[in-house]
Amino acid sequence: MVSPDNRPGTQGPSASAHAHDSRVPRKRPGSWDNNPSTAGNRAVKKRAVRACVSCRDRKVRCDVVNGGPPCTNCRLDDVDCVLKASNRGKHNPARYQARSRLSSNATAPRAPSPSDNINTDADTAAPGPAPGSASATVFRSDHSHGSVATGQPQERRGSQSVAHGDEETICDDDENENNSWHNQQEAEQTRIIHDSQVQPNDIVHETHCEQQPQPQPSQGAATRSTPSAQPANPQTSDYLVALAFQGFYALGWTEQDATEAPPSSSRMDNVSASANTPHADQNHLPLYISPHPSHLDKHDLEFLARKDCLTIPDNQLRDELIRIYVFVVYPFMPAIDLVDFLEPITGSSEVGTVSLLLFQAIMFASVTFIDMQLLQRYGFKNKRAARQVFFNRVKLLYSLGYEADRLTLVQSLLLMTYWYDSDSDEKHTWYWMGLALTTAHIEGLQRDLEEPQQMTKNGRLRRRIWWSCVIRDRLLGLGLRRPSRIQEDEFSVERLRLDDFDISLPPPPAVARLLAAPSYTGKDPVNRQRMANLCIDLSQLCFTIGRILHTQYTIASTPGAGSNYLRRAIVRPRSLKEQAHSFAKCDADLQEWFRSLAPESRYVPGARDGGAAAAQVENSTIRLHKILLYMKYLTAIGALHRPQVFYSGSDSIDPARKADSRRKLTEAAVAITKLAFDLQSNGQMCYAPTSSVPAFLSAALIHLLNIRSPDEETRNISIGRFCQCLDALHQLQSMYTAADEAVHIINNMTENAGFILPLLGIGNPMSKANGIAARNSRLFSAIGPSRVTTAYPSPAPATGNLDTSQEEMISAPIPGAGPTGVALTGQRSRQPSAGPNMTPSATPNLMSIWSAAGNIHSERDLPLPADLMAGIQLDLDAWYNIGDIIDPALMNFETGLDFLNS
């Protein structure tokens, strides 16, 4: 075989036109020397005009020009002979016009012709692709047939095809032009000058966000494009390229020329027009978004554009989503610096930018709580469809490694934990929480910084991010019945304090105008301090929740018999002996937490603050988070005392302790029902998080048990409370898949238990589907649509249908209340009613609904099971093996429903 160093080659046809270069490397002895040089007695020869990719990489001489492809080297080595387009001379024709016009004002520039890019050395030329594209052809050698196979062409820029019989080669374009390194430098300088000319506050590039949209930059939007993007306006491109190479004064640029330059809006009009097609350059981002990372190539960015990941909501939708995030999501997850995030968006700062991954994560976390009418204007059918679209953007950006900063990754992953679609989706809440904690540990957030750095801006942010991880981990463990990942002895970060929150200095005016609540985010720091205290109280509650999960529950060791759920359960209650030494301590910790709450952090039923419109907005927001904090406390009570009530093991439980746990569990269910009424009456149910679903389900199932009570008064009151919780779950169905599963659990249990509730379509001769439709039509027609249309919770309660005595009972403190803040229904006086005998404080809105429905006018109209009419006492421990049905249902929605029918 001929060695690579001695293989034949040919001299290029234009060898006489090239000057000798003293930098030509010395060739080995025995190599071909067609052009010897006398200088230094060194054998110097000219480079071949063309070389295939393989020979170029190996730095050996190629004879593809003489013999045609495949070359001798590729033929002997049996490799593909790939001819690649020359990187020289790939200039945009518009640049030639700019340089000609700016260097000589006497003559007009010549318009480029299609023949400018065709190599004059070619004998025969075939029509090639349009300017701006090219092909690289692969020639495969086939020794068995002695033929050459042509591979798939790959798109490139600025070359033409030349036909050679059945083979297609690529000819060089303008051999005398600058090389590719100069072209890259020109493109980079052009981008820098382009960015410097467009001010951040000129016009914001934006796109309308639809359910399956293509990114469409709005008219007149100033954007940042990738270096691969080609200017859409030739005149503007001429000026920018010439400016990058020669400068203002070298070009003789005058103020008159500047006035004749096209404005940025016209430039972006052309870009918008070209962005409507899937394959157009759609990589434009607003100036407040950080540039694309360098490791993503053109194909990655095109993929992200096709997948809608680069779509930025327009100003109206974006601002509303930001307000939702600040008022609803941020207070209990203060994992970002609000001012640093909002200043670039509002134009208050020209220095910072926002990570695209974090921006899209915030948009996703907020879209759940936005008004449905606004989403429908953008083409979304429901909130679930909007959640899917917004989450897909964040997931693809993360999967492609778009963001490299670990702090930003933790912030984004925490927001991604709001995603839960179904149990079949392996990448749901638990998965993203694990990634967030892993990244946080890699970044070292579990350890405090050194003393001088703790109180810096970055130190406070790191501490808030870590405690956001702790809070989220505890709440997910409580709601998903999973073991919490963070152990108390595995981190050394101090507890949150007010100094960790930026509450002293007011934000810039533009940020305050965006949030539209000056006293909440502006001059008066009192309300910001109250919100920070609520977050601190939640972090302290999560300490106790963590102890409950660690001491009262354990990893399931063996699958349960006959239950699909138990085969998949992660934790189950411990035995009574294991619980005994820690149960009393956890119960005391919960009561101590509740007693130590400051008065401004304590939820008072029916208490509402009035005042100016701005004060109503902020007070309503603070009240919303008081309700959510109280609901999490009640859910923790249920997780602690439920195993005591529904324990079915062989160990005997103290009757007094069991009775006390049953009382507290019922109190918690009653209190959660009142919270549901408060949220509905204020129009704030649309802001309830996913953690409210297990809370309402827990309360509904406790009321469902009390419906079978032999006491008529308790039974009728429990029906109203059950309806209130079920109605709340129905409202949450438009937001969360978990609410669907919770309603499904309740429907199966009521059918299996043989309940007959005509109002809810349960137990009627009609079909199940008709019963559900009848129930929904009656309930929701009486409630009517939500009054909330923006991010500002409505402070006005819907109490027009209540009389004075009912209002007093709602707002009056309950004497003798237990640790949950409410007393049992049987321990206080009630007012008689013509309908089902419910306390007005329990569900007064359901009374008006039932009255309007006209189905139930007296106690005799409600069909009841015969055993209850006979006064048979219900044994909670024996009813449908309640320990294996209700307890899993209250704690976990990641389960099938087959066990309900077993």
Swiss-Prot record:
Residues 168-177 have a biased composition (Acidic residues). SUPFAM superfamilies: Zn2/Cys6 DNA-binding domain. Its main location: nucleus. SMART domains: Fungal_trans, GAL4. GO terms for cellular component: nucleus. Disruption phenotype: Reduces significantly the induction of the FBD cluster gene FPSE_08120 in response to 2-aminophenol (2-AP) treatment. It holds the Pfam family Zn_clus. Transmembrane segments: none annotated. Residues 178-187, 220-234, 262-277, 826-839 have a biased composition (Polar residues). Transcription factor; part of the Fusarium detoxification of benzoxazolinone cluster involved in the degradation of benzoxazolinones produced by the host plant. Maize, wheat, and rye produce the 2 benzoxazinone phytoanticipins 2,4-dihy-droxy-7-methoxy-1,4-benzoxazin-3-one (DIMBOA) and 2,4-dihydroxy-1,4-benzoxazin-3-one (DIBOA) that, due to their inherent instability once released, spontaneously degrade to the more stable corresponding benzoxazolinones, 6-methoxy-2-benzoxazolinone (MBOA) and 2-benzoxazolinone (BOA), respectively. This is Transcription factor FPSE_08121.
